[in-house]
Amino acid sequence: RSHLYAEPDVKRPTAGTISISARVKVVDVSGSFCRIATGHWVHSRHLICLEYGTQDIVGTAIKFIGVPYLWGGRSAEGVDCSSLVQIALAMAGVSVPRDSDLQESAVGVEVPMDDGGDYSRIKEGDFVFFPGHVGLFMDDWRFLHANAFDMQVSLHGFSDVLDRSRSENAGVTSIRRLTSSARSSRHD
């Protein structure tokens, strides 16, 4: 989230906020501030050109650790599992649907796994889908997701997440990996 200012000066009162991945049009520049089409000023360090974005999807998602879980939320005030994925991908210039079931068929390519739960092909940054849920696989067998269990974005041991999902008769439905071609298909 970033503050909006009525003038290009951090010592002036704020005029509101914008959320991460908000699309804005820069119409003027003054020092380290950019005026956006609404007339407000935003510090330039809080803006990323859509043409370049960020390739660090995991890094973007990690910034949300501790943000409250809010079903349907899509800001630092609260996120759900699919909006966490949608925001992280949007910052990389990749547009995906809002809901996890639609993301499952739209994100990257499927990573093969056998019925016995062989996850040897999984890598950091892969998207792991369950019925109605999605998160990011991290290094050291950790799983990053917005969840109603902790009521926040948190890291869990991947084995613990698998055990909990199996106890609810809801195992992994697929693992998806973003390809380099998906990363290069930017927003318009």
Which residue ranges define each predicted feature?
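Surface-exposed patches in mature extracellular/periplasmic domains of secreted proteins
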Residues: Y69-G73, R98-D99
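...with weaker cross-activation on analogous glycine-rich loops/strands in unrelated enzymes
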Residues: V94-D160
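Boundary regions of SH3-family modules and the immediately adjacent low-complexity/disordered segments
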Residues: R1-H3, E7-D9, T14-V67
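Active-site nucleophilic cysteine motif
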Residues: A61, G73-A92
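Surface-exposed interaction/gating patches
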Residues: K25, S83-Q86, G117
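Low-complexity, Gly/Ser/Thr/Pro-rich intrinsically disordered linker/tail segments
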Residues: L162-D188
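Short peripheral tails and domain-boundary helices/loops at the edges of structured domains
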Residues: V42-G59, L144-G171
